[in-house]
Amino acid sequence: MTNIVAPSIFAADPAAHVFDGRLYLYVSYDEPFTNTHDSMVCYHALSTDDLVNWIDHGRILHLENVSWAISHMWAIDANKWKGKYYLTFCAFDEKTSTFRTGLAISDRPEGPFTDLGPVEGVDWGQDPSFYVEGDRAYLIWGGRGQILIAEFNDDLRSVKRETIRNLSEDIAGYEGPFLHKYRDDYYLTYPALDNEKWPQRMSYATARDPLGPYTYRGIFIPEYEGNSGTIHGSVVEFQGKWLAFYHSAWVSGLATSRSLMMSEITYAEDGSIAPLKLDKKIDGAITINSRQILDVSVAPKAGGHLFGVQVSTSGSDFTGAGFVTGLTRQEFGVSVLSQIGLPG
């Protein structure tokens, strides 16, 4: 099973978590057709209770609300810690023009989130991932061919420097790590290159402790037609299924206007993950047999931010994908043009 998730939004780097029986995706946002990753300035959250109907909760954090950052709001993650929801994200620091890992807080899993500032003790804090088990929290991050992990201090404002581990030599990771647990093993999934050649493939390594050491296990998302060059994602169990979320260029054909993907994965008895077979590319517009709804009734208007945008499979007469962008002030409504092409 492989599906495109919410094809009306261009987004990437999905981090999946289940809170109170609902699946949430925390994603970076691709500004459509800008032909650069430098234009990424905000994050969205999406959620579902059935893997079919998705709610886009809208913008959960924007660059304009992060005083220390200037650009490059790339990959993120989120998790629940001591009754609050925390977002770990990365951006270029205004003082150094290098990546730092930021921390933001919310009372709700769908946000919006409020920036708390950078996490101390993290060098080149690109692509942070946030793992919680019991009374311990971990930060995993990576970029420029390195992946590192450390235990958070209790307030999440810094990491315990004595716990920092560089995992790069053992697993040959490139960036974008994510940690999940299956049975008694910890699975670190991450993008990797084959002899420094692009595109990236999704690899994984396992350990008996979150801090490692990790053993490389192989590739479970190989190169496929319609990839976006990069691949970044997560793995989660939901309603009895193990699911991999990642991004591709299946809808736009562009590496900078990416689409969210969902594939079911299977584990063998020895714990290995069966490689996915993604051999079908969808050219141009895709038929999703659903109506895309911008549901203003559940979307409080706040300074141009639209929250609670709903994607629903309530109809079978819509066969395209679109997006609404560029809202800068509070409005009562949005007009959307729909064009229907007849057979022949």
Which residue stretches match the model-derived regions?
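Extracellular carbohydrate recognition and processing domains
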Residues: 225-227, 316-344
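Carbohydrate-active catalytic/glycan-binding domains of CAZyme proteins
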Residues: 1-302, 308, 312, 317, ...
